[in-house]
Amino acid sequence: YVASYRPLVEFAKSHFVPVIAANASADIVRCIGRQGTAYIDKLYSTEKQQIAKQPFAEIPDYKVKFYNFLEKVRQLPEKRKERSYLAQITRDNTMAESIYQAWLDHPEHKIVHLNGTFHSENHLGTVAALKRLNPKLNIQVVTPVQVEQFETIEKLNLDPNLNNDFIYLVKPQPEQYVDASYKRKARQQMFEKSEQATCK
C-alpha cells in the first residue's frame, strides 16, 4: 500500500476525487485459499457483501496462466493449487463487480482501477471478469514497464504475447529509496500475520 497505492490515494483525497476499495476482504480470500468453496457457506450475510456475488465465476484462459505461474514459484498439491486459484478469481471477480457497480452509479465518469499486473495482463483476470459483466464497456489496460534506459519499443525485450493497450516506461526507483531490509521485514510480517489468522 505505502509504495504503490498511498501516493494516489493521497492525491485523490487532496483533490476530492472519489476512491473505492474494489478488492475482496483479505481475510475472506485467505480462508477461501485454505478451505475452498465451502468457506462461503460459513460467512454471515454482511461478510458475503465483501466479495463478488459470483466469486468463483470462471475466467477463460486464466486458470492455465495462474497454474503456470504457480509452477514457477512453488510446488503445491493439486487441491491447494485449486484453492489458490479460487482465492485469486474471488479477488478478480470482486474487483470487476466493484468497478462495474461504480460505473452503474456514475456512468458519466471515467474509472481508473489500479491493480497488480497479473490481474489485468493480456486482458485476463479482472478485465475479463468485467467484460463478462458488460461486453460493451470500453476497457483500456495500461501497463508499466521498468527500464534502465528509455528505448524505442522495438528495442525493448517485451514479452511478444503481451496484449495490453498501452505501456508506459518507468525507471527503477533510485537505490536510496529502495530499502530491501524493510521490504523483507514487511513481507515476513504479512506472511506471519497470514499464518496466524484463523478461519471459521
Per-segment meaning from a language model:
Residues W103, H119-K200:
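C-terminal regions of proteins
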Residues I28-G33, Y39, Y62, Y67, ...:
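Generic local-structure boundary detector
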Residues S84-A87, M95-A102, E108-A128:
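Membrane-water interface signatures at transmembrane helix termini and the short loops
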Residues P18-A22, I111-L114, N138-T143:
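Structural recognition of the beta-strand scaffold that forms the well-ordered cores
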Residues Y1-A102:
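A substrate-binding/cap region within the structured catalytic cores of diverse enzymes
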